[in-house]
């Protein structure tokens, strides 16, 4: 079983995350931030990673700490579930359309964290959600998973569509990259012999 569970408690947030990489995309998400819950549900559904995420944060200040700390805990849980990463496909990329928006996402689950985020929003908010927090989530998730992730919106106008295509693009790329390759089961997908 490729599962991981992380509890993270700070003075700002309390986060509990559990994942099953070989799931069916079932999501039980509660962060107190409606739009963010919707994005995380898309991430679970389209990656086929079962996710349970319960977060309580200092939302009376703003959403930043809750979004960032959820990204940290989710990245750590997926990293834990991967173990030594033996047998994974490792690389994947996807072009994800959503109405007028097209986003490209490429991932290398290498153990080396690096985010390239070339996505720009024409609005500062989606409802009450700050659009700058999309990047904050991706940065935290990338760093704590230990992956190289590139997100680039080629074109688009609607902020909701840009955000959702980024999350769905990540999901579809992870769905491939985290899949076990039957031709290299038990093998580390690197000439170094370690990731």
UniProtKB/Swiss-Prot annotation:
GO cellular component term, pick one: cytoplasm
Record keywords, A-Z: Amino-acid biosynthesis, Cytoplasm, Histidine biosynthesis, Lyase
SUPFAM superfamilies per UniProt: Ribosomal protein S5 domain 2-like
InterPro entries per the UniProt record, alphabetical: IGPD_sf, ImidazoleglycerolP_deHydtase, ImidazoleglycerP_deHydtase_CS, Ribosomal_Su5_D2-typ_SF
Catalytic reactions on record: D-erythro-1-(imidazol-4-yl)glycerol 3-phosphate = 3-(imidazol-4-yl)-2-oxopropyl phosphate + H2O
Enzyme class: lyase
MF (Gene Ontology): imidazoleglycerol-phosphate dehydratase activity
CDD domains (alphabetical): IGPD
EC number: 4.2.1.19
Principal subcellular localization: cytoplasm
Localization per record: Cytoplasm
Gene Ontology biological-process annotations: L-histidine biosynthetic process
Pathway entry: Amino-acid biosynthesis; L-histidine biosynthesis; L-histidine from 5-phospho-alpha-D-ribose 1-diphosphate: step 6/9
Similarity-based family: Belongs to the imidazoleglycerol-phosphate dehydratase family.
Protein name, entry field: Imidazoleglycerol-phosphate dehydratase
Species of the source: Beijerinckia indica subsp. indica (strain ATCC 9039 / DSM 1715 / NCIMB 8712)
Organism placement in taxonomy: Bacteria, Pseudomonadati, Pseudomonadota, Alphaproteobacteria, Hyphomicrobiales
């Amino acid at each position: 079983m490729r599962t991981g569970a992380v509890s993270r408690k700070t003075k700002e947030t309390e986060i509990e995350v559990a994942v099953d990489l070989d799931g069916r995309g079932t999501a039980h998400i509660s962060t107190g931030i409606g739009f963010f819950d919707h994005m995380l549900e898309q991430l679970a559904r389209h990656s086929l990673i079962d996710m349970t995420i319960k977060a309580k944060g200092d939302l009376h200040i703003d959403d930043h700490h809750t979004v960032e700390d959820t990204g940290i805990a989710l990245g750590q849980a997926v990293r834990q579930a991967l173990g030594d990463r033996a047998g994974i496909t490792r690389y994947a990329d996807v072009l994800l359309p959503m109405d007028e928006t097209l986003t490209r996402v490429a991932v290398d689950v290498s153990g080396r964290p690096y985010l390239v985020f070339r996505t720009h929003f024409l609005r500062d908010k989606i409802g009450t959600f700050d659009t700058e927090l999309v990047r904050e989530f991706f940065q935290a998730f990338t760093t704590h998973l230990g992956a190289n992730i590139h997100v680039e919106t080629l074109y688009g106008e609607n902020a909701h569509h840009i955000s959702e295509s980024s999350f769905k693009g990540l999901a579809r790329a992870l769905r491939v990259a985290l899949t076990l390759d039957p031709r290299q089961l038990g093998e580390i997908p690197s000439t170094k012999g370690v990731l």
